[in-house]
Structures are given as C-alpha cells and as structure tokens.
Amino acid sequence: MNFKIPQFPDFEISITAFENVTNSESIRSKVATLPYAFLDARMIYSQEQLYAALYRVLVEQNYNKLRTKTIHSEIMLCLSPTSNIGDAFKKFGIKEDSSTVICLHIKDRSDEPELPSLSSIVEGQEISLSKEFINQHRDIGMVGHVYKINGEMIENSTEDQVSSMIVNMIQLRGL
C-alpha cells in the first residue's frame, strides 16, 4: 500500500504486511541498517493507530523535532505511549519470535531511488494490510498492557472506542 498524506506532499509512505515470517531474528540483527521500520504486527490494534503515528512522525520531521536517528525509528517511538526510545523499540519493533510483520517506509524527495527489495529481506508471505489482517494478528492483551487499557475497558468498549483511546495516547504523548 503506497500513499501520500495531503499535508505532506513531499513524502510517500509505503506499508507492507507479511505473515509466516521465518527470519525475524536475522531482520532484527540488521534493522538499524535498513531503510524501513519493522513492526511486530501483534502490537498494532488498528490502521488508525498506524496512521496517527505516521502523521506524528511527519509533523516532527517537518519541524526538525525527531528524537531518534532516523525517521523510521521515530515511527516506533511515535507508536509508544511513553517517551522512552528503548522501550518503544522493544515493544513495537520486530522481535525474534515475530511471525507477522508490518514494514513501513517513508520516502522523501532526497531518498535514493533504489531501496533494497522487501522480498530480499523478509522471508514470508507478503499480504495486503487490511483491517482483517490487523484483527487476525493483533494481541489485544499485549496492546492493552502497553497502553494501560485493562481487560474490562476493552470488553466494555467497541473496537472503534479502543482504537480512539490508543490514537489519543499517541497524539497526546509529551504534551
């Protein structure tokens, strides 16, 4: 899935999902050298959560406020409800046991035109990122724990309400 956000026409965003990934450990060992953000799909509750983090990254990039070394590592920090960079990488980044992965790339006009192909990096089945994919692979317990949304709140809320809680935490962190 490739798209642009109207407020940031100089950036093109690419999101690719993989399942049945068999080389997570290998990807994790070289993640710092790759021009992608590799997320553990279990930690993504909704597409809105991803979009909120991406929007925040682009705002911070626009105002030169990135706190990490790259725009791709900033994605993980922006997903986090806290400002701890290491904690964000541990919770949202690819893990050694990740079998479902979401790969993001933010390209601006200064990027090199040729990127390493994701199919040469990820050993797994590429599939379309959809609501169904996210619903199938998310771990509500892990997501609830990270965002401090208890099981009762999740059970008594609609899916959209839980997604809104997460998006609000992403947007309000640090204010």
From Swiss-Prot:
Entry's Gene Ontology BP terms: positive regulation of transcription by RNA polymerase II; telomere maintenance via recombination; tRNA threonylcarbamoyladenosine modification
UniProt-annotated location(s): Nucleus; Chromosome, Telomere
Source organism, top-level taxon: Eukaryota
Keyword terms: Activator, Chromosome, Nucleus, Telomere, Transcription, Transcription regulation, tRNA processing
A GO cellular component entry from the record: chromosome, telomeric region
Gene Ontology molecular-function annotations: tRNA binding
Stated role: Component of the EKC/KEOPS complex that is required for the formation of a threonylcarbamoyl group on adenosine at position 37 (t(6)A37) in tRNAs that read codons beginning with adenine. The complex is probably involved in the transfer of the threonylcarbamoyl moiety of threonylcarbamoyl-AMP (TC-AMP) to the N6 group of A37. CGI121 acts as an allosteric effector that regulates the t(6)A activity of the complex. The EKC/KEOPS complex also promotes both telomere uncapping and telomere elongation. The complex is required for efficient recruitment of transcriptional coactivators.
Subunit structure: Component of the EKC/KEOPS complex composed of at least BUD32, CGI121, GON7, KAE1 and PCC1; the whole complex dimerizes.
Family: Belongs to the CGI121/TPRKB family.
Name assigned to this protein: EKC/KEOPS complex subunit CGI121
Recorded name of the encoding gene: CGI121
